[in-house]
A protein has these predicted regions:
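Predominantly late transmembrane helices and immediately cytosolic-facing juxtamembrane segments
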Residues: 2-21, 38-41, 178, 206, ...
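Interfacial helix-loop-helix linkers and transmembrane-helix boundary segments
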Residues: 69, 89-104, 129-131, 157-159, ...
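Structural signature of hydrophobic alpha-helical transmembrane segments
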Residues: 69-80, 129-143, 184-197, 233-241, ...
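Entry/N-cap segments of selected transmembrane alpha helices
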Residues: 90-118, 188-200, 285-311, 334-338, ...
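Functional cores that coordinate and move charged inorganic groups
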Residues: 149, 153-246
Length: 393
């Protein structure tokens, strides 16, 4: 190879290695978020908005009458299906299998969701029109957070990375429960009963030892359709369907769950989540920033993510060690724990998702909330990276 081409070739190989690694999904999300912000504040912002929100003249499912609806209620159900697969694997035979291993991540996730919610309610003064958004700063974007950790490489102890992953997994489970309990209204009992029967059938197939991936995929699709029409958010269908997929190895030494997770995880990380980011992260920055009452919502979310999440996760680790309930990750300093706690404040995907559910009736509140999500996530990511970078020297 000619010498002049070597730098380009080396750069290309480095880029491929990066994109294949854990940092790739996080970096892709950063690029997508920036692209969405640029487009939302460009001369093409109107066209960009219409692309996702224009009512479709023809759609096979009446409830999904726009590209935005297909992404948020359709593609994101598949994202939650992958989340469900991961949760089941981790609980049955992964890092959350042993009770002792669950203690610290569960406590950290619990306080990491409760404290941001309290910060949000305190800043908004529990205003009735804003109260439904209390769960927005309670979420963690695992792709972003792990991407930042991966950028630091071996300078961060493996125990810290594992701690972040397990906290984020428990956090995802908590977010799913919140969506099911808080952001569900107008239940259609007939469709809900149909969803229950489909779920029972899928569970029965698991108990009978049926290990055919296509059967569970078909069942998941039917369950999603029923839940979509029941009034419960269809993301719940993704998680419930995943929990029926068998993890045990069959006679050929294969696992339906592991095979599905291996196939769908890259699709979720490199296609579904970026598409969701493009459709939801774009927010027009106003000429005059919000002030007074209008500032309360974005400020509450940003402080919930940056201050509340950091304080909740770090406080949980400190309390667990102080009361000998659990020990902090092996080989990690308190400053490193603080850095990882800050990274848990990167809400992005899940926070934007909950924003759409919380303020679906008020487009202006959605836009205000997006400012808080993006600002808080950015500050949390920068603080976490800076703290971990400093301790890694």
């Amino acid at each position: 190879m000619p010498a002049r081409n070597r730098p380009i070739s080396n750069l290309a190989r480095a880029a491929v290695r990066l994109l294949r690694g854990e940092a790739g999904a996080g970096l892709l999300l950063i690029g997508v978020a920036l692209a969405a912000m640029v487009l939302a504040n460009s001369p093409w912002s109107g066209l960009w908005h219409d692309l996702f929100h224009h009512q479709l003249a023809a759609t096979p499912i009446a409830r999904l009458d726009s590209l935005h609806a297909w992404i948020n209620d359709g593609l994101m159900a598949l994202f939650f299906f992958v989340v469900g697969l991961e949760i089941k694997r981790e609980v049955l035979e992964g890092d959350l299998a042993a009770p002792a291993q669950r203690r610290l991540p569960v406590l950290a996730a619990a306080l990491g969701m409760a404290v941001p919610a309290l910060v949000y309610l305190a800043v908004t003064n529990a205003a009735p029109q804003l109260a439904r958004g209390w769960a927005i700063p309670a979420a963690t974007d695992i792709a972003f957070a792990v991407g930042v950790i991966a950028l630091l490489g071996r300078r961060v102890p493996p125990s810290l990375r594992l701690f972040l992953l397990t906290v984020a997994i428990v956090d995802d489970l908590g977010a799913v429960v919140i969506i099911a309990l808080v952001y569900t209204a107008g239940i259609d009992l007939v469709w809900l009963a149909a969803a229950g029967m489909i779920l029972a059938a899928m569970t029965g197939l698991n108990l009978l030892g049926v290990a055919r991936g296509w059967i569970y995929a078909l069942g998941a699709g039917l369950l999603w359709f029923a839940v979509l029409h029941s009034g419960v958010h269809p993301s719940i269908a993704g998680v419930l369907a995943a929990l029926t997929v068998p993890l045990a190895l069959d006679r050929a030494g294969d696992s339906v769950l592991l095979r599905m997770e291996h196939t769908l995880t890259p699709i979720s990380a490199y296609a579904i989540v970026p598409i969701f980011g493009l459709a939801n992260a774009g927010v027009a920055i106003p000429a005059a920033m919000p002030n007074g009452a209008a500032l309360a919502l974005p400020l509450a979310i940003a402080l919930g993510l940056l201050v509340g999440k950091t304080a909740g996760v770090f406080g949980a680790v400190w309390l667990a060690e102080a009361f000998k309930f659990a020990e902090r990750p092996a080989g990690a300093s308190w400053l490193q724990v603080l850095g990882v706690a800050a990274l848990c404040g990167i809400g992005f995907t899940m926070s934007l998702f909950i924003t759409q559910l919380a303020f679906s009736a008020s487009p202006q509140l959605v836009e205000d909330a997006k400012l808080g999500v993006l600002g808080g996530s950015l500050l949390a990511g920068l603080c976490g990276y800076a703290l971990l970078r400093r301790t890694a020297r």
